[in-house]
């Protein structure tokens, strides 16, 4: 499901949780980059990795634990975080959460 340009949409309701899993939905993709919506069930994680560009993420439901260069940050619904390019980062879900990045 893609979002309609020029329309208001509810990001949190565009994706469901999968029991014991992570779900991703690419909402937009072009030469400048992409926008992806994720849902993480409790206990799930994304292992440490880097990206060659800054990444802005916003939690749209729940809260996540985001480790950036070894520092753990708790990011809650409505809050955002910019991950600097090249920074080692990982994600974990103590509770279910949804984010857009």
Language model regions located:
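A short, N-terminal "cap"/entry segment at the start of jelly-roll beta-barrel domains
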Residues: 1-32, 67
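Short acidic-glycine-tyrosine-enriched beta hairpin
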Residues: 70-85
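Ligand-binding loop in jelly-roll beta-barrel domains
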Residues: 85-101
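A cytosolic small-molecule/anion-sensing beta-strand core signal
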Residues: 60-61, 76-77, 95
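Conserved short histidine dyad/triad with adjacent acidic residue
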Residues: 20-21, 36-51
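Short, conserved beta-strand element in jelly-roll/cupin
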Residues: 39-41, 51-66
